[in-house]
Amino acid sequence: AGEECDCGSPANPCCDAATCKLRPGAQCADGLCCDQCRFIKKGTVCRPARGDWNDDTCTGQSADCPRNGLYG
């Protein structure tokens, strides 16, 4: 509990491996919507459409790539 990021790799520039907390100024450490310790801007495709699924896009508020669901 209390971990903000995966402290498995001391090489991660976004995460302090000793404390498992994000480094100062970092918004995220990993994830499809995280780039260079920052959230990727809203609307950026993080998982392209496949079959009956829409493109999944970043929210701008999270490092996760949410499932946007089936075509309407």
Swiss-Prot record:
Record SMART domains: DISIN
A GO molecular function held by the record: toxin activity
Gene Ontology CC entries for this record: extracellular region; plasma membrane
Motif Cell attachment site: chain residues: 50-52
Compartments reported by the entry: Secreted
Tissue: Expressed by the venom gland.
Pfam (any one): Disintegrin
Keywords: Cell adhesion impairing toxin, Disulfide bond, Hemostasis impairing toxin, Platelet aggregation inhibiting toxin, Secreted, Toxin
InterPro entries given in the database record: Disintegrin_CS, Disintegrin_dom, Disintegrin_dom_sf
Major localization class: secreted
Domain Disintegrin: 1-72
Disulfide bond positions: 5-20, 7-15, 14-37, 28-34, 33-58, 46-65
Other known facts: The disintegrin belongs to the medium disintegrin subfamily.
Quaternary data: Monomer.
Protein name: Disintegrin crotatroxin
